């Protein structure tokens, strides 16, 4: 048993296995991108229409509110524009050659798949900077891509697919900055890259703000801890040591991004007391009625509903809602049945049991896991700030609207990998002298995650209404695949 365990660990730790995981993730994303009828459930129509809107203007930002109704909210004050601007470039090319909607949507979805796979590569690189073994890191990546909503999101148009690599890239830059400080190397250039990436992330999606806050807090703490504050002469020498071209690029990019950051978040805060404004704060509510999230919240706010202000009770419901929407498979807004969703019980039950037991075990060994691992501490700190921010925003909506809204598991994707790795580390410490037990847990977990995990749930639960219309080959391919994986779902009988 011990020898078998060692062989499996060697396989998991191999670079080939790491690349194989990324290849499987790409395959899954491409499958979803090619098969799924437009629009998919995760606001894909909203993002596609904004891409088209960006293609009609020269400026990379929308600085003037379009006339008429506001189906996309207060666009002129919305900072989340980077993803839509970037994809508007290939959209223009596709439009110029007269590509069909099928070709256009699938092609743009491929860019989303590429962004996600880039993020997976960067997160692998980041997590290998921790004290965790390569086998543990690759196991975390494997379980992550088997979460059903991960390939579903990767294969559609959504700015979360760009947010994923931006979070990884920023944290990777922060880790490099910290390493240079500890080793007493020149750190100023890396600090500037980190600031640049943080600003860029906030212009892709406003939920990057807590990540930026955590990163800046950590950077300032590192500077203070190593007594680098006040050393103007040293900082000036580092500045002079940077190549002129690098200095100009960094300063120019930071200046542009900082101006945009202040234009959106700064002006919003000053004028509307909110860095992310509500539609009715900027334009007439009658025009906002066509913006579905605003209309939903507006109607809920008009209805007096008493809710328990107990944060513990909310947290239980919030955790359950997040968990369900991490592990469900869902179709889009078209077809006879809209937003039909299913959860495969084997993967859901396995994830629940492993998470709860793993959390208890991890708390027992947390100090030992994080000892002498500042990179892991930094990553988890940023992740915790993000989760608390997300929870706080949802709790505030709950108190003001009387219902839980926007409880979506996919919002956890950008920071989920480090926490999966933390749970794996907990199991490793708890059973460090029992390789046979670790092997059984690992193989059983992989087996259960295979039932409904990745794209298997999509293939099993979907039907012709879930696929692009008129694409007979796609229907036959999914039907054949459903037959092949049907033995995994015998538990339903």
Where do the PLM segments sit?
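Perimembrane helix-loop-helix junctions
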Residues: 1-4, 178-179, 211-258, 367
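Transmembrane signal-anchor helices characteristic of membrane glycosylation enzymes that use polyprenol
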Residues: 13-44, 52-61, 71, 253-270, ...
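Extracytosolic helix-loop segments that constitute the early lumenal/periplasmic catalytic or substrate-binding loops
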Residues: 28, 45-78, 82, 92-95, ...
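Short acidic/glycine- and proline-prone juxtamembrane loop motifs at membrane-interface regions
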Residues: 41, 149-163
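Transmembrane-helix signature of polytopic, membrane-embedded enzymes
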Residues: 97-102, 123-146, 164, 185, ...
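Transmembrane-helix motifs of polytopic, lipid-linked glycan transferases
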Residues: 106-131, 169, 357-361
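Membrane-interface alpha helices of multi-pass inner-membrane proteins
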Residues: 189-206, 211-216
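Membrane-lumen/periplasm interface segments of specific transmembrane helices
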Residues: 221, 225, 246-357
């Amino acid at each position: 048993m011990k020898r078998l365990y060692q062989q499996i660990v060697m396989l998991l730790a191999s670079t080939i296995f790491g690349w194989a995981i990324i290849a499987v993730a790409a395959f899954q994303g491409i499958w979803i991108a090619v098969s799924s009828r437009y629009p998919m459930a995760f606001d894909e129509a909203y993002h596609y229409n904004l891409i088209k809107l960006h293609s009609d203007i020269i400026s990379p930002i929308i600085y003037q509110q379009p006339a008429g109704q506001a189906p996309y909210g207060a666009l002129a004050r919305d900072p989340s524009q980077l993803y839509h601007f970037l994809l508007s470039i290939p959209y223009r090319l596709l439009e110029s050659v007269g590509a069909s909607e099928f070709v256009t949507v699938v092609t743009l979805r491929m860019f989303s798949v590429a962004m996600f796979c880039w993020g997976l590569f960067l997160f692998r690189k980041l997590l290998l900077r921790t004290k965790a073994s390569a086998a543990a890191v690759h196991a975390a990546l494997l379980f992550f891509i088997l979460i059903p909503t991960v390939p579903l999101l990767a294969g559609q148009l959504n700015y979360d697919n760009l947010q994923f690599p931006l979070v990884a890239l920023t944290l990777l830059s922060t880790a490099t900055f910290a390493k240079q400080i500890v080793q007493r190397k020149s750190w100023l250039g890396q600090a500037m890259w980190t600031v640049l990436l943080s600003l860029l992330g906030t212009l892709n999606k406003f939920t990057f703000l807590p990540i930026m806050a955590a990163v800046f807090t950590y950077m300032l703490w590192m500077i203070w801890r190593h007594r680098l504050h006040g050393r103007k002469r040293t900082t000036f020498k580092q500045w002079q040591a940077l190549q002129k071209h690098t200095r100009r690029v960094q300063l120019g990019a930071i200046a542009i991004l900082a101006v945009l950051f202040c234009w959106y978040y700064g002006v919003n805060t000053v004028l509307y007391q909110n860095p992310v404004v509500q539609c009715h704060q900027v334009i007439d509510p009658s025009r906002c009625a066509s913006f579905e999230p605003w209309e939903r919240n507006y109607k809920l706010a008009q209805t007096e509903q008493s809710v328990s202000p107990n944060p513990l009770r909310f947290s239980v419901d919030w955790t359950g809602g997040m968990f369900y929407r991490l592990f469900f498979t869902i179709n889009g807004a078209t077809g006879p049945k809209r937003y039909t969703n299913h959860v495969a019980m084997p993967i859901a039950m396995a994830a629940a049991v492993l998470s709860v037991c793993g959390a208890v075990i991890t708390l027992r060994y947390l100090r030992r896991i994080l000892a002498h691992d500042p990179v892991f501490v930094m990553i988890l700190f940023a992740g915790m700030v993000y989760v608390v921010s997300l929870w706080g925003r949802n709790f505030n909506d709950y108190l003001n609207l009387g219902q839980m809204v926007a409880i979506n598991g996919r919002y956890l994707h950008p920071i989920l990998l480090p926490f999966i790795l933390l749970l794996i580390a907990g199991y490793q410490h708890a059973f460090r002298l029992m390789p046979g037990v670790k092997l059984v847990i690992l193989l059983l977990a992989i087996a259960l995650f295979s039932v409904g995990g990745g794209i298997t749930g999509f293939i099993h639960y979907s039907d012709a209404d879930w696929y692009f219309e008129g694409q007979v080959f796609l229907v036959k391919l999914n039907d054949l695949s459903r037959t092949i994986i049907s033995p995994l779902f015998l538990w339903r009988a």
